[in-house]
Structure formats: structure tokens, C-alpha cells
């Protein structure tokens, strides 16, 4: 090593390599969930994440081999160098490694992030096609090594990463609305963590493709951030609940099958009475993990018609069910106060159908405009 800085970089580089290798082997070999035993993550997501970690690990290996080859030509390198210019040979190695990184990293990281959105399958071929100009610009750089085409290749990759980020954020935003339209309980289904993953991924990709080879400090930053990023990615994969057996999972259609025509007004007007009888009066809303599809089957209507009804009412399915649950909580609270029964807000929230108190607290504040504690104090003076 030439300096302490080189030693530190090799340590970070080796740490990132081992972190990606361990994460890959964990996802491939361990069937259980070590992070959240009660959560079953999507198998497709685990496979995409394992592929991403494998590509990251292999990428670290081939860049390391290229580094040592450029520093110390082995016997094969010497023989080849007798025919070709050594500098040109190194540029070929850089091109191959860069293009492999581009195709492998962008494809697998995009596949992983899209697999977190379980409303439908999204094609990856546009991402693969988008990497082709990068390879072409690198080939032109080999033919005309004046730096122009290399700068264009870098600028193209940075722009591609920005556009990919915009697309992923839009897809996540649509998925968030789809969840609210189809599920009452969003615990282990929420996508706030996915937004964080998208932006961190964008930052690392832009730093990696745009600046790492030009500034040594950027190389340190990328390797330093890669280790916690791999851990965060693995945690996100293992804490995302699979939606199998529910509406819209693993289908090629962007949304659940829809009738060619909208529901007749008479049908929509009758849905209100069906909901009153089968959901509100029967207190079906107390059932945890009640989905739009399950509710539509119970009341005997098409789930698309039911979705249309909620849209007509200016509601989402999530808001409708949680509204009923909050009203149930309020009734339980007043009964408990009137009978002087001991209780906790957490207990009443659970009896009202909420799986977690944090979900209840957020829904309550959004609907009532106050925190649970403040509302109880203002209502009866009891906290």
C-alpha cells in the first residue's frame, strides 16, 4: 500500500464486497426471515435482491482484478501487450467493466425496487435498452480517445439515473394510491421506506457512474455508503409483506380486471345498502387485513363496482374502513368511561380492528384533527 488512505480504501472496498456477498447468500440459502419472523416477503423480491447483491459482489471482484492487472501485468497480459498497446488494452478492460456494471447494476436494482410494488408486474426491457447508448459511447471513446465520448457517456448515465428516479417515484406514488384503494391495514405494506430506498439508490448510482472514477474522495464515499445501503436494502426486502392471495398480485394487468363499462347508477346506489347491512351492521370492518376483494365477495358485488362506489363518494377503501373503526373506537371509549371500566387507548384500538397502534394513531389524527390523547382529554378529561 502506498499510504494509509489506500489501506483504508481497500478495507472499505473489502467490507462492501463481503456485505454484498453475505446478503446474497442469506437470501439464496435462508428460507426463514431473520429480520421479521412474522413477515413473509415476496419470493420474487428476494430473488431480485439476491441478483442485485450478486452483481454488486461480482462488480467489486472484476474491478479489483482490473486494478491489479493495470498495475502489474501478468504473463498473459505481457504476451497480449506485445501485440496491442497496453494503454489501449486497459481501456478495453475499463469499457467491459463499465458496461457490465451499467447493465447489471441498473437492471437488478430496478428489478428489486419494482418488485416492492406488488400491484402489477412492470417490464424491465426499457432499462436494458437504455444501457445500449452507454456501450456505444464507450466504443466510440476507444476509437476516438480524446475524452469527448467518455464525457458524453458519463452525462448520459447521470441523466438516465435521474429519469429512472422520476419513473420509480411516480410508480411508487401510484402504488400508494392502489394500496389505499384495496387494503384497510397497511402495516408492513407501506412504501415510505421504498421512497427512501429510491433516493439513496439514485444518489449512489449518480456518484458511481458520474464521479467515482474522477475523484478519489467520491470513491471513498461510494464504498462507505454502500455497506449501510446493503444492510438497509436487505432489511427492506425482509420487512415487506407479501400480498399473495389478495387483489392484484402477480398479474400482468396494471389493475384488477375491470368491466368494459362503468357500473350502472342503480348498482352503485344499491352498494350503499349492501355495505350498511353486511359491513357496518355486521361489524365486518373489525376483521384485520380485510381487503377490497374480500369485502366485495361478502356483500355480493364486483370489486371494481365497489371501488367505483368509493370513488363516487370521494373516499378510498382505506379511509372508509378506518373511518368505521375510528367510530367504533369512539363508541368503545364512551362506553368504558360511562361504566368506569379500566382501559388503555391501545386496547380499544385493537378491539376496533387496528393491527398496530401507530396505524390507528395516524388514522385518528387525520380523521379527527387531534391526537388520541388530546381528543380524550378534551372530550372527557380522561387520558
Give the residues covered by each predicted segment.
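The cytoplasmic-loop to transmembrane-helix boundary for the fourth helix
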Residues: 47, 114-140, 144, 154-157, ...
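N-terminal low-complexity or simple alpha-helical regulatory segments
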Residues: 1-135, 151-152
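Structural signal for membrane-spanning alpha-helices in multi-pass inner-membrane proteins
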Residues: 24-27, 63, 137-141, 208-209, ...
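Transmembrane helix-loop junctions in multipass membrane proteins, especially transporters and channels
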Residues: 32-35, 68-72, 117-120, 142-146, ...
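Membrane-proximal linker segments that couple transmembrane helices to downstream signaling/catalytic modules
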Residues: 235-352, 358, 363-366, 373-383
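Alpha-helical bundle regulatory/interaction domains
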Residues: 110, 145-273, 303, 343-353, ...
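Short helix-coil transition/hinge motifs at the ends and kinks of transmembrane helices
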Residues: 32-40, 179-184, 338-340
